[in-house]
Amino acid sequence: MAIDKTTLAILACPKCKGKLTYYADKDELVCRGERLAYPIDENIPVLIADKARELSSEELEKVPS
């Protein structure tokens, strides 16, 4: 599922309120500042910090800017 640009522009990381990037390869929303990836479940972003997974430096490098 792709997130449209308008929706992505209004979403923010619940932890730091920073910008999120859509990572199509994993179908996740990524916060670079917190190094967290939020899942998308049945086309709904799950923006709950406890549900996010931490990204390694290697994974973070693969996420498009």
Curated annotation (Swiss-Prot):
Cellular component annotations (GO), alphabetically ordered: cytosol
Origin: domain of life: Bacteria
InterPro entries given in the database record: Trm112-like (IPR005651)
Pfam families attached to this UniProt entry: Trm112p
Coiled coil: none
UniProt similarity note: Belongs to the UPF0434 family.
Name of the protein: UPF0434 protein IL1511
Protein species of origin: Idiomarina loihiensis (strain ATCC BAA-735 / DSM 15497 / L2-TR)
